[in-house]
Amino acid sequence: MRTDTPPIALTPGDPCGIGPEIIARAWLEQPEVTRACFVAGDVGVMRRALALLQAPVSLPIAVIDSPAEALTLPPRCLPVLQVVDPAPELPWGVVDARAGRLAGECVLWATRAALRGEVAAIVTAPLHKEALHAAGSPWDRYPGHTELLQAESARHTGVPLAQMPVRMMLANDE
């Protein structure tokens, strides 16, 4: 595998929602697609998502210390970089400020890693905007995580927010 290109960071989204499950399922069902990727999030959240899937095949979590380490791992494991304080177990399907904060912190970490050149790209799993706003400052300043990405990029480059273009792509099977 090429190691001259940084890996891709996936943020787990809202731990009370479908984001962690989507990511875990991708690693289980399409390991060839996730080969140069890692989760920038919480190990416990991802363990819980894997358990939810009740998959016939075991998928171990590899706790990594840096984004680059994801490129050195063998296939059939889920690399997770713990970028937030360990999360408590949160209830499924509930708007929770703690979940919003975790989701926002993961996106912020991944954004900064991309701006430093440590990751080639960011993929964000779904997060709940209401939970993000419930987390309070600074998360309630942004309508969603796209605006958070824009604000952090503007801050990093030293340009006014209005002059910072945002390029994003939505991807699905349809």
PLM features: residue spans?
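Anion-binding alpha/beta catalytic cores of soluble intermediary-metabolism enzymes, centered on
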Residues: M1-E174
